[in-house]
C-alpha cells in the first residue's frame, strides 16, 4: 500500500489523537495578539485530506466504479442504500446505512509500527424483507469476517419476525409485532431458514463479500463528499 493509503487508514484516528495531546496543554492568549481566521489553514487541510482520499480510491477502491450486486437494483440516498429484486411472487428488499459502519480501531496496534496499514472496511448491519401479499418475513443481520479467510464475510441473524407488508410507503413495523433473537433457534431451523432459504434468494457468502466491498466504496465516497461540503461551507 502506498503513502496515500496509509494516510487514509490512519487519518481518522491518528489526527484525532494528536489533537487531544495538543488540547491538553494550557493555552495562553496574548491580549494584544491579532485575531486571525482559521479558515485558510482549514481549507488547506481539507484540500490535502480530499486529495489523499481520492488517491486511495484510485489505488485501492476502483476509483469511481462501485461494485455491483448480481440480480439486484441499487438505489441510494445520502447514507442509505437499498437493494431490490423480484423472486417469483416475492419482493425482496435489502437496506443498509453506512453511517458509523467503519471500525477505525479494528486492525490497528497501539504503536504505529506497521509498514502497511490496513484499509478500513465498512461492515454495516442490514435488514432483509421478503414480502408476499400482505405479509413480510424480516431479518436483521450483522456482517462477520470468516475466520482464517481474509476478505471473506458471512452474516449472523440477530433478529427475525413476520410483519404486515409496507403500505403507502410506510415501512415501520408495528410495535406489537413479536420478534425473536436469532441466537436461540434449533440448529436444523438455523440451517434451513437462516442459510438455505436466504441463499436461494441470492443472500449468500458472495452477496456478503459484495456488500462489504460496495459499502466500503460508498462510505468512502460519502466521507469525501462530507469533506467537500465542509470546504464549501466555510468558504461562503
UniProtKB/Swiss-Prot annotation:
Keywords: Mitochondrion, Transit peptide. Residues 1-36 form a transit peptide. GO terms for cellular component: mitochondrial matrix. It is found in: Mitochondrion matrix. Gene3D superfamilies: Mitochondrial glycoprotein (3.10.280.10). It comes from the Eukaryota. InterPro entries: MAM33, MAM33_sf. The keyword Cell division does not apply. One of its GO terms (biological process) is cytosolic ribosome assembly. Transmembrane segments: none annotated. The keyword Cell cycle does not apply. PANTHER family: COMPLEMENT COMPONENT 1, COMPLEMENT COMPONENT 1 Q SUBCOMPONENT-BINDING PROTEIN, MITOCHONDRIAL. Belongs to the MAM33 family. This is Conserved regulator of innate immunity protein 3. The gene is cri-3.
Amino acid at each position: 500500500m502506498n503513502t496515500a493509503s496509509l494516510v487514509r487508514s490512519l487519518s481518522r484516528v491518528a489526527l484525532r489523537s494528536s489533537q487531544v495531546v495538543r488540547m491538553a496543554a494550557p493555552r495562553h492568549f496574548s491580549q494584544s495578539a491579532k485575531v486571525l481566521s482559521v479558515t485558510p489553514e482549514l481549507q488547506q487541510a481539507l484540500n490535502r485530506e480530499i486529495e489523499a482520499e481520492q488517491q486511495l480510491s484510485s489505488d485501492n477502491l476502483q476509483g469511481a466504479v462501485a461494485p455491483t450486486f448480481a440480480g439486484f437494483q441499487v438505489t441510494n440516498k445520502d447514507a442509505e442504500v437499498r437493494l431490490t429484486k423480484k423472486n417469483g411472487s416475492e419482493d425482496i428488499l435489502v437496506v443498509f446505512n453506512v453511517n458509523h459502519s467503519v471500525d477505525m480501531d479494528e486492525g490497528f496496534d497501539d504503536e504505529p509500527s506497521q509498514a502497511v496499514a490496513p484499509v478500513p472496511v465498512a461492515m454495516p448491519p442490514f435488514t432483509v424483507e421478503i414480502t408476499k401479499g400482505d405479509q413480510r418475513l424480516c431479518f436483521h443481520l450483522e456482517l462477520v469476517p470468516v475466520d482464517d479467510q481474509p476478505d471473506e464475510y458471512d452474516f449472523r441473524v440477530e433478529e427475525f419476525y413476520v410483519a404486515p407488508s409496507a403500505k403507502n410507503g410506510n415501512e415501520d413495523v408495528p410495535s406489537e409485532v413479536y420478534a425473536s433473537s436469532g441466537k436461540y433457534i434449533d440448529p436444523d431451523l438455523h440451517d434451513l431458514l437462516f442459510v438455505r432459504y436466504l441463499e436461494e434468494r441470492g443472500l449468500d457468502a458472495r452477496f456478503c463479500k459484495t456488500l462489504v466491498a460496495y459499502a466500503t466504496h460508498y462510505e468512502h465516497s460519502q466521507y469525501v463528499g462530507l469533506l467537500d461540503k465542509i470546504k464549501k461551507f466555510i468558504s461562503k
